[in-house]
Amino acid sequence: MRILGLILAGGHSSRMGQDKASLKFGRKTLAENQREILVKHHFPVAISSNTSAKTDIAIPVLPDPAEVKYAGPLAGIYAGLQYASTNNYQFVLTMPVDCPIIPDEFFVKMTSAIDTTTCLRIASTPSGLQPTFALWATKLKSDLFNFLIGSENKSIRSFAFAHNVSIVRFDNVYSEGAFFNVNTPEDYQYLQENFRIKDEKQS
């Protein structure tokens, strides 16, 4: 089974006040950090983005398709499923650009024992579901398009729970800083002050 790694970076970063993908984490930007993590785990990589600012990291940049543009993370995921379908990937593994500390266990558990019956897996931590950390079967592309066109509630959760989602639990890693989400300048400062060493470990 071929799996595409997709970095979700299509948001407006409104709470941060600047493009989160370009923020530095150690020696790298957050986008570069996510790319390197995926490459380390042997995944081909693309990035969902509606600006050209991420093109300097030398991976395919997938803007939201016009018919679903700015429909939230699902629009970026749909772009990834389109790309995966065209390029013969059976699955898309998504991760947000603003969560730079990802345990190796994530990649193992999310992609283990997949087959043609696997539909959608979403990660869960002690703080709850992490909908942007997910494994999507490429065959969901048409269903997702119809959902985006026809549904007012365009949340990942709404789509997932109508499509045989499996929840993959990560209960023992959150205290290590895994899945920490950078939404605000305060979050970014906390990341830099408390988890900078993680950047060195993942290099």
Regions picked out by a protein language model, each given a short descriptive name:
Residues 156:
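Flexible, D/E/H-enriched segments
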Residues 181:
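PAPS-dependent sulfotransferase catalytic core
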Residues 1-153, 161-176, 185, 192-199:
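Nucleotide and nucleotide-moiety/phosphate-recognizing core
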Residues 202-203:
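Cationic, low-complexity basic patches in intrinsically disordered or flexible, solvent-exposed regions
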